[in-house]
């Protein structure tokens, strides 16, 4: 029956005789067979018996079988088929219930699957499934590891903003390093498309009274501020309906701050939040209440009540000035690092410096290299656009408990945050329950490298800001975590990071209810080949767990020699995970290297609690986050609490 169907689909393509590689590729696509060109090219060459670059219908049939026949799928099919040829509707229901843990299973669901994936009409009409149809179903999105219910917004979005992890970027305007790399609008567009909800804009005085965006004291190129926010306006809500926060690193003079304020109001219009919401005069609103809104994060003058009373008044030329303490050692170190960078480039940038006092003056903001205060000037017009995201310097947990207001947010550098998280984790978590806290990379990361964000998610930090332009493990974790909740960029924190009565400490887990996770890594499908001349397709897989310190672990398979097309491991791994709500699972595929070390081939990261049980397909992504379809892993997953 399958042979008859197969020949009916391909005969017309061979009426003119043999076909070449390009026509072979097109015919496979016509048959809905996803395949990598590099693998098809090799298989075509192996099956072209006359080595003329053209194949017969029988040779094509052999290629098709190599690409679609997977022994591991045949074994599952035969286990549930009564005659090893056809799955009856009841057989499919049994498989979905017993192996895939499909809840609320019914013949109706089984029938829908048959109608969608069974290609042979007479089998489909009989409400049955052939091996061909079963293979297509097992290779479909419905059988992916990531739960379908996590692909949509399913969490309660009516909690205050501080109850959520918020996808956040650092130096969003950069697409390379921080010293001489280009600034590019693509940095903002790309971040927004990936679901990022907090963007950083580094603002400086520009020529012709136009504020510019670039990495100060360096040779990075410049973008007009108004052009940046126009791009943000276009893409802000393309991926997510939930609020976008513009985190301004404001180095502009008051005059150009007024221009920034005008640009923001003109560009965003009603989308720009410029006053308190009536229902939230003294608490942070929820993502739901702020749908399609843009929030400005910046320094602010006075209270929200005063801002409300000034609404509609003329603010032109009105400026406030005050001295602000540089409260912590890390900030002094970072100012000094910036100061050193400015010395490197001063001949190019033409900055003026007082050699004796070590003071560098920058467009209305004076930074003191050695003193512990700095003077700030802010235009009232810009200040009044800051509502629920007022930037406030972090001084201490005690100071925050006594004086910090609900709408004041802190930004803490990674070095200081790491020290605090290790020494005073409970106080840090108490702080992040009440106040939005942003963690950013240290200034010495001139190459735009990233830290591991997991350690700061573990203590409830809402905005863990990463350099989105830099691929690697940190961005894999970022992308994996924010797959959840429909990729909305907002994930409700676990109850123990929200509730005041909780005494959770990620380094001292008590009274936990661990999950036992079992993963049987069965096989790989069309794994990518590297460009390395030494690559022989010697493949292995590493499974890693990221979460609280006690849950961090990894295990790996043996190496399958000279087979990247269809390696079979059939190895089982078990993990005990104490805090599953914070755990991420990462699959990494590598090619074994004897001299230069293993070579990265692809990876996939996702939250543990977004993992389907049963036989599942694991898609793979490149180092840059691009899909490597049809490359994937085939696994069996089981976990129980």
From Swiss-Prot:
Q: What does this protein do?
A: The production of the second messenger molecules diacylglycerol (DAG) and inositol 1,4,5-trisphosphate (IP3) is mediated by activated phosphatidylinositol-specific phospholipase C enzymes. In vitro, hydrolyzes PtdIns(4,5)P2 in a Ca(2+)-dependent manner. Triggers intracellular Ca(2+) oscillations in oocytes solely during M phase and is involved in inducing oocyte activation and initiating embryonic development up to the blastocyst stage.
The gene name on file is: PLCZ1
Keyword Nucleus present in the record's keywords: the answer is: yes
**Name of the top EC class for this enzyme:** hydrolase
Query: What InterPro entries does the record point to?
Result: C2_dom, C2_domain_sf, EF-hand-dom_pair, EF_hand_dom, PI-PLC_fam, PLC-like_Pdiesterase_TIM-brl, PLC_EF-hand-like, PLipase_C_PInositol-sp_X_dom
Q: Which GO terms describe its molecular function?
A: calcium ion binding; phosphatidylinositol-4,5-bisphosphate phospholipase C activity
Q: Which residues belong to the signal peptide in this entry? A: none
Record's GO cellular component terms: nucleus; perinuclear region of cytoplasm
From which lineage does this chain's organism come?
A: Eukaryota, Metazoa, Chordata, Craniata, Vertebrata
Domain EF-hand, chain residue ranges per copy: 35-70
UniProt main location, coarse: nucleus
Question: Which reactions appear under catalytic activity for this entry?
Answer: a 1,2-diacyl-sn-glycero-3-phospho-(1D-myo-inositol-4,5-bisphosphate) + H2O = 1D-myo-inositol 1,4,5-trisphosphate + a 1,2-diacyl-sn-glycerol + H(+)
Name all C2 domain ranges. Answer: 498-622
Looking up Gene3D superfamilies in the UniProt record yields:
C2 domain (2.60.40.150), EF-hand (1.10.238.10), Phosphatidylinositol (PI) phosphodiesterase (3.20.20.190)
Name of the protein this chain belongs to: 1-phosphatidylinositol 4,5-bisphosphate phosphodiesterase zeta-1
Q: Per its UniProt entry, which superkingdom is the organism in?
A: Eukaryota
User: In the Enzyme Commission scheme, what number(s) does this protein have?
Assistant: 3.1.4.11
Q: Which residues form the PI-PLC X-box domain?
A: 155-299
Domain remark in the UniProt entry: The EF-hand and C2 domains are essential for triggering Ca(2+) oscillating activity and the regulation of PLCZ1 enzyme activity.
Write out the catalytic residues in the record: 170, 215
């Amino acid at each position: 029956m399958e042979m008859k169907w197969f020949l009916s689909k391909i005969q017309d393509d061979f009426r003119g005789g043999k076909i070449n590689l390009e026509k072979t590729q097109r015919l496979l696509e016509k048959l809905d067979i996803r395949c990598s060109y590099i693998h098809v090219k090799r298989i075509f060459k192996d099956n072209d018996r006359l080595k003329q670059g053209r194949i017969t219908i029988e040779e094509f049939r052999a290629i098709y079988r190599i690409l679609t026949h997977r022994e591991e799928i045949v074994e599952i099919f035969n286990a549930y088929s009564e005659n090893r040829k056809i799955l009856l509707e009841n057989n499919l229901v049994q498989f979905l219930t017993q192996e895939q843990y499909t809840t609320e299973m019914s013949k109706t669901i089984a029938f829908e699957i048959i109608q969608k994936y069974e290609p042979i009409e007479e089998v489909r009409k009989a409400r049955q499934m052939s091996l061909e149809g079963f293979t297509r179903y097992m290779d479909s999105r419905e059988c992916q590891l990531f739960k379908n219910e996590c692909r949509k917004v399913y969490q309660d979005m009516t909690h205050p903003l501080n109850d959520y992890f918020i996808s956040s970027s650092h130096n969003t305007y950069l697409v390379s390093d921080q010293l001489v790399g280009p600034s590019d609008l693509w940095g903002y567009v790309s971040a927004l498309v990936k679901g990022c909800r907090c963007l950083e804009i580094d603002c400086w005085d520009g020529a012709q009274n136009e504020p510019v965006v670039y990495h100060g004291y360096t040779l990075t190129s410049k973008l007009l501020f108004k052009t940046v926010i126009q791009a943000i306006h276009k893409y802000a809500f393309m991926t997510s309906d939930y609020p976008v926060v513009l985190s301004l690193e404001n180095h502009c003079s008051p005059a150009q701050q007024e221009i920034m304020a005008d640009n923001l109001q003109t560009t965003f219009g009603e989308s720009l939040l410029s006053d308190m919401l009536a229902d939230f005069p003294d608490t942070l609103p929820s993502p739901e209440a702020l749908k399609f809104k843009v929030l400005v994060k910046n320094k602010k003058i006075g209270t929200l009540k005063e801002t409300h009373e000034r609404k509609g008044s003329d603010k032109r030329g009105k400026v406030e000035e005050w001295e602000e303490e540089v409260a912590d050692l890390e900030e002094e170190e970072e100012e000094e690092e910036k100061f050193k960078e400015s010395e490197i480039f001063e001949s190019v940038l033409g900055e003026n410096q007082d050699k004796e006092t070590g003071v560098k003056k920058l467009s209305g903001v004076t930074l003191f290299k050695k003193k512990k205060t700095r003077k700030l000037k802010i235009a009232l017009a810009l200040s009044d656009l800051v509502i629920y995201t007022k930037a406030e310097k972090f001084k201490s947990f005690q100071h925050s408990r006594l004086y910090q207001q609900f709408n004041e947010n802190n930004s803490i550098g990674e070095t200081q945050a790491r020290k605090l998280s290790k020494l005073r984790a409970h106080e840090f978590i108490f702080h992040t329950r009440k106040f939005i806290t942003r963690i950013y990379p240290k200034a010495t990361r001139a190459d735009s490298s990233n830290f591991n964000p997991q350690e700061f998610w573990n203590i409830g930090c809402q905005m863990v800001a990463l350099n989105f332009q830099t691929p690697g493990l940190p961005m894999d974790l970022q992308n994996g975590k924010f797959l959840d909740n429909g990729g909305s960029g907002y994930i409700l924190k676990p109850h123990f990071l929200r509730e005041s009565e909780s005494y959770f400490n990620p380094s001292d887990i008590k009274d936990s209810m661990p999950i036992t996770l079992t993963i049987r890594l069965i096989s790989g499908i069309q794994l990518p080949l590297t460009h390395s001349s030494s690559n022989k397709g010697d493949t292995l897989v590493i499974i890693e767990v990221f979460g609280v310190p006690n849950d961090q672990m990894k295990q790996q398979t043996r190496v399958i020699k000279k087979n990247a097309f269809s390696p079979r491991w059939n190895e089982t791994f078990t993990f005990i995970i104490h805090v599953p709500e914070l755990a991420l699972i990462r699959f990494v595929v590598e090619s074994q290297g004897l001299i230069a070390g293993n070579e990265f081939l692809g990876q996939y990261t996702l939250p543990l609690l977004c993992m389907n049980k049963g036989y599942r397909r694991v898609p793979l992504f490149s180092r840059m986050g691009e899909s490597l379809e049809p490359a994937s892993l085939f696994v069996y997953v089981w976990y129980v609490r």
